[in-house]
From Swiss-Prot:
Primary location group: secreted
UniProt: Zn(2+) binding residues: H330, H334, H340
Protein name: Zinc metalloproteinase-disintegrin stejnitin
Domain named Peptidase M12B: residues: 194-392
Cofactor: Zn(2+)
Organism: Trimeresurus stejnegeri (Chinese green tree viper)
Disulphide connectivity of cysteines: C305-C387, C345-C369, C347-C352, C403-C422, C414-C432, C416-C427, C426-C449, C440-C446, C445-C470, C458-C477
Record domain Disintegrin: where: 400-484
Cellular component GO terms, alphabetical: extracellular region; plasma membrane
Additional comment: The disintegrin domain belongs to the long disintegrin subfamily.
A biological process from GO: proteolysis
Length: 484
């Protein structure tokens, strides 16, 4: 019998609030100190796993109690995830580490409209969550024999450089005569789920910046990938880390002050080297280089799935992984073909992912313009989406399945989320099985829990694709081949 694990951690607020402190996230003004105290509701004698699949944290923010629900990001790594390092004499060393019992989580604050949290539980609690529209960070205080953590607003972190920063992609502003749909009205369904199998490469400047600590670099990349999953949920895109590479002995492509030249050189390297030994949909270079003209990153536009140009480059900020993830998401957005936001585009935050100017308060949201462009055009473009159908599928994602996480995994017919949130009458949220009499729970060929009739048009021809028709045997809309 499968036992449901409930972990509650009570965080008692320290008797005082600090005014200023130097943390891993940087210099922080105005923070709260809390002490995690873990209480586990496990049967007597049960073996507690190192990192639970689901956890709950209760603590106070500004004197108000909140409940943080966390669930392990089971799809963070693909099944054939690998790490490539290099020996001092330049020999390539590729390993396939066991990543099933990792410590990276997604979550939400109970009863808060913004379902956003990204947390590492590897050594204490480190990450961010959204509460009442504001971004809060939590991280351990490095005190001897202490479980103390700091909780603080993102806006209270002193920025290393307040000057405006730019995206290196130009002439891509949103322009449309069509009325902009609100995000809640977009026709994005689980049937349109896509997957980006991502390789992240840390260059030699990253290696020297982190004093050769490859473990710290890898942890930073895991945090970034975990954040990317939170960001791309709105597009029904799952980002799976399929490879990580670190360059300890020197740059393997030309990394210069010019973001354009660096991007071109990295693209050439992926063509002549990476593609021959590691399948992937997209590769991103994380660099310690500070580019000219305050450029934070660069990416080719509308090149996702391209044999050579499905790449991007992003400047690292050591203390701000969420900021780096925001910039990498921006570049991936351009790879997909998403334009910069115009003045009329909104996302309910101070800035959105595809804003042309980089905000010091990074967003986790795509604007209504981005969502509209993606759902109405990009998702149906065979050139920029053809590689995003092939997984990792439910048989490829590492870690045991968990019912209620919105992902249909091995042994499940459907997954509409927790019972309190499920709005799909075809799916039993408690068991992730179809309800009695139902043939399907979702898909373009699923109507009122039954398969659509064979031959029904489910997706019109577009570009090089033929019309797609229901088979009568599945709720999914099968892809027909390219036109001759």
């Amino acid at each position: 019998m499968i036992q449901v694990l409930l972990v509650t951690i009570c965080l008692a607020v320290f008797p005082y609030q600090g005014n200023s402190i130097i943390l891993e996230s940087g210099n922080v003004n105005d923070y709260e100190v809390v002490y995690p105290r873990k209480v586990t509701a496990l049967p007597k004698g049960a073996v507690q796993p190192k990192y639970e699949d689901a956890m709950q944290y209760e603590f106070k923010v500004n004197g108000e109690p909140v409940v943080l629900h966390l669930e392990k990001n089971k799809g963070l790594f693909s099944e054939d995830y690998s790490e490539t390092h290099y020996s001092p004499d330049g020999r390539e060393i590729t390993t396939y580490p066991s990543v099933e019992d990792h410590c990276y989580y997604h979550g939400r604050i109970q009863n808060d409209a913004d379902l956003t949290a990204s947390i590492s539980a590897c050594n204490g609690l480190k990450g961010y969550f959204k509460l009442q529209g504001e971004t809060y960070l939590i991280e351990p205080l490095k005190l001897p024999d202490s479980e103390a953590h700091a909780v603080f607003k993102y806006e209270n972190v002193e920025k290393e450089d307040e000057a405006p920063k730019m995206c290196g992609v130009t002439e891509t502003n949103w322009e449309s005569d069509e009325p902009i749909k609100k995000a809640s009205q977009l026709n994005l369904t689980p049937d349109e789920q896509r997957f980006i199998e991502l390789v992240i490469v840390a260059d030699h400047r990253m290696y020297t910046k982190y004093d050769g600590d490859e473990t710290e670099i890898s942890s930073k990349i895991y945090e970034i990938a975990n954040d990317l999953n939170v960001i791309f949920r709105a597009l029904y895109i799952h980002v799976a880390l399929i490879g990580l590479e670190i360059w300890p002995s020197g740059e393997l492509c030309n990394v210069t002050l010019s973001a354009d030249d660096t991007l071109d050189s990295f693209a050439e390297w992926t063509k002549r080297d990476l593609q021959k030994r590691k399948r992937h949909d997209n590769a991103q270079l994380l660099t310690g280089m500070i580019f000219n003209e305050k450029i934070e990153g660069r990416a080719y536009k509308k090149t996702m799935c391209h044999w050579k140009r499905s790449v991007g480059i992003v400047r690292d900020h050591r203390t701000r992984p969420h900021f780096v993830a925001n910039r990498m998401a921006h570049g991936l957005g351009h790879n997909l073909g998403i334009n910069h936001d115009g003045d009329s585009c909104t996302c309910g935050a101070n800035s959105c992912i595809m804003s042309a100017t980089v905000s010091n308060d990074p967003s986790s949201r795509f604007s209504d313009c981005s969502l509209n462009q993606y759902s109405s055009d990009i998702i149906h473009n065979p050139y920029t989406s053809r590689c995003l159908y092939n997984g990792p599928w439910k048989t490829d994602i590492v870690s045991p399945p968990v019912c209620g996480n919105y992902y249909v995994e091995v042994g499940e017919d459907c997954d509409c989320g927790p019972p309190a949130n499920c709005q799909n009458r075809c799916c039993d949220a408690a068991t992730c099985r179809l309800t009695p009499g139902s043939q399907c729970a979702e898909g373009l060929c699923c109507e009122q829990c039954r398969f659509s009739t064979e031959g029904k048009l489910c997706r019109e021809a577009k570009g090089d694709w033929n019309n797609d028709y229901c088979s009568g045997q599945s709720g999914d809309c099968p892809r027909n081949p390219f036109r001759a």
